[in-house]
Amino acid sequence: MKKYTYVPGSFIAAWLIWELIVRLGGFNEALFPTPYKVLLGFGELIGDGVLFKDIADSLVRFFIGYIISVVAGVFFGLILGWYKGIWNYINPIVQVIRPISPVAWLPFIVLFFGIGQTPAIVIIFIAAFFPVLLSTVSAIQNIDPVYIKVARNFGIKQPELLFKIVLPAVFPGIASGLHIALGTAWIFLVTGEMVGSQTGLGFLIIDMRNNLRNDLLMVAILTIGFVGLLLDWGVSLIEKWIYKRWGIEK
């Protein structure tokens, strides 16, 4: 809890620095709004119901894409990590595709899925899939073989071996991939919404920019940061619950 005592102070310091930059820099507040104007902007968008609706729309797209990517990434990661011969053939292809930005696939995504919320979901899936896949494969390949030998000596077979021995042993490695995937998926969700959606926080940024409402533009930007922080915090809570349930010390 001690680390949270610094949070109010850090936000107050950021507020003051922001205010000083605007005042001393002589910026036009219509172009670079003060913190107070942004605070009023929060009130305006909350009062209109726009902010919460866009947050909800973004979260729906995010969770659909993220959950599908986690399930697929862990599933294929377990298989490819367990069968190293198959992974040796798949790995070069993965290493070529993995560095490509999900946005680069957008013309083909639109071609196959059309315009709307589906392209954003597909972009989220691509962004989150590879961190989860690679962390799962790495965790499986680095599992201590003693765990498997002892389990087999006690007569433990599949699927009990998977759920009681393998998954608890590799979960810390998978968890790191889940955190990386969360961040990249949230970033690219906003990018996807900027291109093809008519709702969501990414669309809100484009809409406010086109309407020259930089105060509301800043509201959307800050909201993306705060929601991303809450999502990461939520994943951490789930992670701790799983650690506790499986009796894993972190």
Predicted regions mapped to residue ranges:
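Loop-to-helix entry region at the N-terminal start of transmembrane alpha-helices
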Residues: K53-R61, L111-V132, A175, L216-I221
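Cytoplasmic-entry segments and transmembrane alpha-helices of multi-pass inner-membrane transporters
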Residues: F75-V110, L134-I143, K149
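Transmembrane alpha-helices
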Residues: V122, I126, Q158-T191
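Short cytoplasmic-facing helical segments at TM-TM junctions of multi-pass membrane proteins
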Residues: A139-A175, I205
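Glycine-rich helix-loop "coupling/hinge" segments at transmembrane-helix boundaries
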Residues: V110-L111, I187-I224, Y243, I248-K250
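Periplasmic/extracellular loop-to-transmembrane helix junction in inner-membrane transport proteins
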Residues: L24-I67
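Faces of alpha-helical transmembrane segments in polytopic inner-membrane proteins
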Residues: A72, F76, I97-P102, I123-V137, ...
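C-terminal transmembrane helix and the adjacent membrane-cytosol boundary/short C-terminal tail
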Residues: K84, S176, M218-K250
